[in-house]
């Protein structure tokens, strides 16, 4: 039977988003690029097979799942494995299959602790276990996809992203019948590609920022609701929440704003 893990609080033991992806990819020989791609449930099923061989019907897992009902089917397999091994954790399937960062990141943080508590270090061939099936990244639709200038796809698919590298309709001179490619076109295309990748990185960082800000806001509300209890622990939490960097001065709301940068 499995060792149950109940702690879900954010601690220094939690891996960052990038470290978590690296651990998953290395352990299962996958190529995930986003936490949201865990919404298919396939990776969790294979981790359960690694921890407790035979606990899940791995043949029923759709490693190439692309549709929500296929994700749900995978999580049903995972739920059956949890029940078989006595895992008490309730899987928020309805939230996970939506492919949102916050829900999937919270669940994988718990799962990593669960894995560490149960893994005995035995060797495991993930590719052979899934019979060589290649996984397919879920077709996630980000909430900012309506921005006209946002590049499509993920950072890993950058080389296949169509980029118009400032192709100018120059007329051939000297009767050669050929349009010479400007020397700076390759460099421009490379710079545009770097910009696109950086935009995606910024978007991911903003999601992560909003995720942790939401947690801090919830903590603040709890402290405010119990403000009259004079609990020293709550008071200490409030002090930490409102602490500022050394030398930081809160600006006077009535003072005119000066020295703003001009662009």
Curated annotation (Swiss-Prot):
GO biological process: attachment of mitotic spindle microtubules to kinetochore; cell division; establishment of mitotic spindle orientation; negative regulation of microtubule polymerization; protein localization to astral microtubule; protein localization to microtubule
Keyword presence, Cell cycle: yes
EB1 C-terminal domain span: 180-250
InterPro entries: CH_dom, CH_dom_sf, EB1_C, EB1_C_sf, MAPRE
GO cellular component, one term: mitotic spindle pole
Pfam families assigned to the protein according to its UniProt record, in alphabetical order: CH, EB1
Gene3D superfamilies the record matches: 1.20.5.1430, Calponin-like domain
Alphabetical keyword list: Cell cycle, Cell division, Cytoplasm, Cytoskeleton, Golgi apparatus, Microtubule, Mitosis
Compartment annotation: Cytoplasm, Cytoskeleton; Cytoplasm, Cytoskeleton, Microtubule organizing center, Centrosome; Golgi apparatus; Cytoplasm, Cytoskeleton, Spindle
GO molecular function, a single term: microtubule plus-end binding
Main location: cytoplasm
SUPFAM superfamilies: Calponin-homology domain, CH-domain (SSF47576), EB1 dimerisation domain-like (SSF140612)
Domain Calponin-homology (CH): 14-116
Family affiliation: Belongs to the MAPRE family.
Function: Plus-end tracking protein (+TIP) that binds to the plus-end of microtubules and regulates the dynamics of the microtubule cytoskeleton. Promotes cytoplasmic microtubule nucleation and elongation. Involved in mitotic spindle positioning by stabilizing microtubules and promoting dynamic connection between astral microtubules and the cortex during mitotic chromosome segregation.
Database matches in PANTHER family: MICROTUBULE-ASSOCIATED PROTEIN RP/EB FAMILY MEMBER (PTHR10623)
Protein name as it appears in the record: Microtubule-associated protein RP/EB family member 1
